[in-house]
UniProtKB/Swiss-Prot annotation:
Its main location: cytoplasm. This is Valine--tRNA ligase. Its EC number is 6.1.1.9. One of its GO terms (cellular component) is cytosol. The gene is valS.
Length: 903
């Protein structure tokens, strides 16, 4: 490594190199860098700024949570967008916050109280318990904020929000009252997912399905005499027959047509009879072709019950125990009743058949683990028809654009066929439903600035967490008040989230956002063509993070990755670049340790390249005249401009993977592997030349722009390197590269690009030939080739240095030669390798390499010949193995040929 100095002046670039440590250690700098950014106010948005506004609201993580890989992907992409827009001259608001997470938080606190005090929530008043939750939130709720800082989130911490903040509570009460007064909120007895342990309704997203081993029991209803009316039905939940009110058959099933319209007695209940009804829902080919109907405890039965106006008796209380059946089974748990009811039916001779084991999928509570009970319950609901239509219209009209467009149909599937939304939860932690009941039966909705009359009592339920989350884009900016934030930053520019919460959160934000804008256009702005304003103009949906084999991360598989482990082991930039480099719109992203190590190596490569450039005089102070530059200089500047243009196009369209892959390839394969190596030749070892000074300027110029292009994905290493290179205040406040920062807007020099491509091919082929001949990489050999014939005279010195060949002596005699086809001619390279190769040692090395290649060929062949593996493995994994097989096959051919040449 050489350092160019002027004899009369100290080299400023050498001084800047001294500011860098000897090696890149992210742990040593990341925390201080981040705090410095925050203290400098770089992330604080100013609504009074004259810059154009750009805003993102962070999908609020649960206050109970810790950062997982899905969060890390979300945050990396949002941060990349925010950092780039700041550099492009926008006033950026990236607004952070947390969700109160009703069920999750209440469950955590109840578990804590049970462990520490041996008490349940019922041992406290409601107010006392809620105070306990606030205490817990204060002590434990900041974990995810610390992790956000660790990965570099450039959020405006001064505007951090919590869904139970006073301002957000006011927004919740306001929209509830507006919806209620518009007739869009109502109370009704309908089927819900019920958690007997939590004693509340839960949303679909809080239900996880597991395969359960049970038994399929066939029950005979009606007469035990085969000559008299009877029907056989099958069930895995025998206990629910206590709530059966009907048996359904297909209208065209001749076996049961004579029974349709009749009734059968209930085996245990005198107050119920079983009506035989005909319905297309029934599959006549499945089982007996008859289905037992329990409308209050099964969603399909409930829908059928509505169609046929059936009674809907509930047979379980809120704890999941049998209740109000008037039978000996009252008071039993579901599991106890399942056994006892089957035994009692068997005593009556009504058990026709039992199938054990019978594996079926059963919904379980994500929080408490027990089987969810579909249960008829009095709840509060949002009527969604009009809201869903506005949400669909907004996307169809282009007010909100979904990226990728291929996910639009999934969005329309939700909003075009949406069912009314159950918004009440039987919890204590959350937004209390603002409905009050008078002593004479009056029901009123009380707004945020109103008081309930004396003697009225408030509804005990709280709202579904997703209700307050649906207001997040505008409630966090001060709605229902008129605020500078809403004027400047609403609607938000983009929502970034995973496609799996398209319905649970995204569609509901669209519903409430358009409704709030329709009701208060003076606060949220007017939409287009009379439509309400939308909460975000772009919606970017990314995929899910999976393990390196494409499998979903789960506790049962033990394949989860803690992103903070990667931050500790490889640095935040490695985590971020791995995720950004793999983030294709709407496509799942497989990651593994190899990915993180590769990204860490890339950060180290950037560090070493910058340090080398600085030690060799690189300066960022403009460019010489283009005519004074070498082919290599013009080529790297032109490539930089091409890459900049592509990266801009990709990022404008949320193509994060393509943008970062292109930057990776340019930085590693073109700038480091080729231009830096050529620059070593262009910068003289001693003294100063015009070409050397020009190269130093080009080195600094390219590095300056490259670091700025990489900054959104890799903020920490680029900050350290950019400051050392430029002596600038911070890369955060630098400008995003334009053509003026790359090749000065010049036309691409196609001849220079052609000659560099020829150099790359020439060097690669000679290196490969040397290796095949057994010549050590460090060993110089004499060689003869005509550089003028292939238009590479200017680059002769670089080529000779890169492939370790020297000018031949007068008595030169070739011992080997190769022909290489370049763009303008075929060049013959003659080499004298005599005396440079130990034939015996070379043969031994080649035989060892051949054994390794054959083993790889065998291993990949076995995998690709395994039909079971091919059926299960993701396409990407199979293609990777095919690639390995092809490389191994080529290696076997190459080594075998070389061994034959050695004789």
């Amino acid at each position: 490594m050489v350092c160019v100095t002027d004899q009369n002046n100290e080299n400023p670039s050498q001084n800047r190199a001294d500011k860098l440590p000897k090696s890149w250690d992210p742990k040593a700098v990341e925390a201080d860098l981040y705090q410095g950014w925050v203290d400098a106010g770089y992330f604080t948005a100013d609504p009074a700024s004259e810059k154009p506004g750009y805003s993102i609201v962070l999908p609020p993580p649960n206050v109970t949570g810790q950062l997982h890989m899905g969060h890390a992907l979300d945050h990396t992409l949002m941060d990349a967008l925010a950092r780039r827009k700041r550099m492009q001259g926008f006033e950026v608001l990236w607004l952070p916050g947390m969700d109160h997470a009703g069920i999750a938080t209440q469950t955590k606190v109840e578990e804590m109280l049970k462990e520490t005090e041996g008490k349940s929530r019922y041992d406290y008043s409601r107010e006392e318990f809620i105070e306990k939750v606030w205490e817990w939130k204060k002590e434990y709720g900041g974990k995810i904020g610390e992790q956000m800082r660790a990965i570099g989130d450039s959020v405006d911490w001064s505007r951090e929000r919590f869904t139970l903040d006073e301002g957000l509570s006011r927004a919740v009460q306001t929209i509830f009252k507006k919806l209620y007064d518009s007739g869009m909120i109502y109370q009704a007895n309908r089927l819900v997912n019920w958690s007997p342990v939590l004693e509340t309704a839960v949303s679909d997203i809080e239900v996880v399905y597991k395969d359960v081993e049970g038994e399929l029991v066939s029950i005979r209803y009606g007469s035990l005499n085969d000559d008299e009316p009877h029907v056989v039905v099958a069930t895995t939940r025998v206990e629910t027959m206590l709530g059966d009110v009907a048996v359904a058959v297909h209208p065209d099933d001749e076996r049961y047509r004579h029974l349709v319209g009749t009734t059968l007695p209930h085996p245990f209940r005198d107050d119920l009879t079983l009506k035989v009804v005909a319905d297309d829902y029934v599959d006549p080919e499945f089982g007996s072709g008859a289905v037992k109907i329990t409308p209050a405890h099964d969603p399909n039965d409930y829908a059928l019950g509505l169609r046929h106006h059936l009674d809907m008796p509930t047979i379980m209380d809120k704890t999941g125990r049998i209740a109000d059946t008037g039978t000996q089974f009252d008071g039993m748990t579901r599991e106890e009743a399942r056994v006892k009811v089957r035994e009692a039916l068997a005593e009556q001779g009504r058990i026709v058949k039992e199938v054990r084991p019978y594996v079926h999928s059963v919904g379980h509570s994500e929080r408490s683990g027990e089987a969810i009970e579909p249960r008829l319950s009095l709840q509060w609901w949002v009527k969604v028809e009009e809201l869903a239509k506005m949400s669909g219209d907004a996307v169809r009209a282009g007010d909100t654009t979904i990226h990728p467009k291929s996910l639009e149909p999934r969005y329309f599937d939700w909003v075009d066929d949406m069912h009314d939304w159950c918004i009440s939860r039987q919890l204590w932690w959350g937004h209390r439903i603002p409905i009050w009941y008078g002593p004479d039966g009056d029901v009123i909705c009380v707004g945020p600035d109103e008081q309930a009359p004396e003697g009225y009592t408030q509804d005990p339920d709280v709202l579904d967490t997703w209700f307050s989350s649906a207001l997040w884009p505008f409630s966090t900016m001060g709605w229902p008040d008129k605020t500078p934030e809403l004027d400047k930053f609403y609607p938000t520019s983009v929502l970034v989230t995973a496609y799996d919460i398209l319905f649970f959160w995204v569609a509901r934000m669209m519903m409430f956002g358009t409704f709030a804008a329709k009701e208060t256009p003076e606060l949220l702005g007017e939409g287009t063509d009379g439509r309400p304003q939308v909460p975000f103009t772009d919606l970017f949906l990314h995929g899910l993070v999976r393990d390196e084999h494409g499998r979903k991360m789960s506790k049962s598989l033990g394949n989860g990755i803690d992103p903070m482990d990667w931050v500790d082991n490889y640095g935040a930039d490695a985590l971020r670049f791995t995720l950004a480099r793999g983030a294709n719109p709407g496509v799942d992203l497989p990651v593994g340790e190899d990915s993180a190590q590769s990204s860490r190596n890339f950060a180290t490569k950037l560090f070493n390249a910058t340090r080398f450039a600085l030690m060799n005089g690189a300066v960022s102070e403009g460019l010489p005249e283009r005519a004074e530059l070498t082919d290599a200089d013009r080529w790297i500047l032109d490539r930089l401009e091409e890459v900049r243009g592509h990266v801009d196009d990709y990022l404008d369209n949320y193509q994060f993977a393509k943008a970062n892959e292109e930057l990776y390839h340019f930085a590693w394969n073109e700038f480091c592997d080729w231009y830096l190596e050529i620059a070593k030749v262009q910068i003289p070892r001693e003294g100063v030349t015009e070409r050397g000074r020009n190269t130093q300027q080009v080195l600094g110029h390219v590095l300056d722009a490259l670091l700025r292009l990489l900054h959104p994905a890799m903020p920490f290493v680029t900050e350290v390197l950019w400051k050392a290179l430029t002596d600038g205040e911070s890369i955060v406040t630098s400008s995003w590269p334009t053509p003026a920062d790359t090749n000065g807007g010049a036309a691409v020099d196609a001849d220079a690009a052609r000659r560099i491509a020829d150099v790359e091919k020439l060097v690669t082929e000679i290196r490969r030939f040397r290796s095949d001949q057994g010549v050590k990489p460090s060993q110089k050999v004499p060689a003869r080739l005509d550089f003028a014939a292939c238009d590479l005279t200017e680059l002769e010195g670089a080529v000779r240095a890169l492939v370790r060949i020297e000018e031949p002596a007068e008595d030169f005699e070739e011992s080997a030669s190769l022909e290489i086809r370049l763009s303008t001619a075929t060049i013959t390279v003659e080499l004298d390798t005599s005396g440079t190769v130990d034939v015996a040692a070379e043969r031994k090395r080649l035989e060892k390499d051949l054994a390794t290649a054959n083993k790889e060929l065998e291993t990949t062949g076995k995998k690709l010949g395994n039909e079971a593996f091919l059926a299960k493995a993701p396409d990407a994994v199979v293609e990777k193995i095919r690639g390995r097989q092809q490389v191994a096959r080529e290696e076997v051919e190459r080594i075998t040929k070389r061994l034959e040449e050695l004789g």
